[in-house]
Amino acid sequence: MKKYLIFAAATFMCLTACAQNSKKMNENKTLIAWFSWSGNTEAVVNHIAEVTGADTFRIEREKPYPEQYDPCTVDAKQEVDNNVFPAIKGLPENFGQYETVIVAVPVWWYTAPMPVRTFLEKSGLDWSGKTVIPLCTAYTAEYNTLKDIVKATPDAEHLEGLAVITTKMNGEDIDKKFPQIDAWLKKLNL
């Protein structure tokens, strides 16, 4: 009988702890809104989603960028130089349920790609009451990318962002950056 009571008490405590953890995760629902062309940002997002359980939403330009590097960079530079906000494909369902939004982007021409700016500034999404966390992948430096994401969401609160610097493309060797990413997530309590 004593063993039964100990077992029942232990089971109850485990179930209570699981329920509290589940409640905590549901209280602060997280979305990762991301854009990727070469695959680096996508690889980072996949890792973060796996570690945190966050939902993901891919920001896509309605008219896809060229698959070849040089023509893609020409299109992207023209958009930045002319402050063009290209049309994007859709918006996240139930955006209002998310308290935290990680905005993950590559650095293009010293800032976030213009489809991301469309998502942040021209989509009609309500950023008030949200916490936005900027993240970028870059070949050399983040330049103003993290600051530009913050500037584009003035009604949100913001947490410390992260720049993941890598000289590879297609997500190659991005796993070597996972310890840096994991330490950042831990610091943010995600």
Provide a role label for each language-model segment.
Residues 1-23:
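Bacterial Sec-dependent N-terminal signal peptides
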Residues 123-131, 136:
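Short, acidic/small-residue loops that bind anionic groups at enzyme active sites
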Residues 133-168:
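Short, glycine-/small-residue-rich phosphate/pyrophosphate-handling segment
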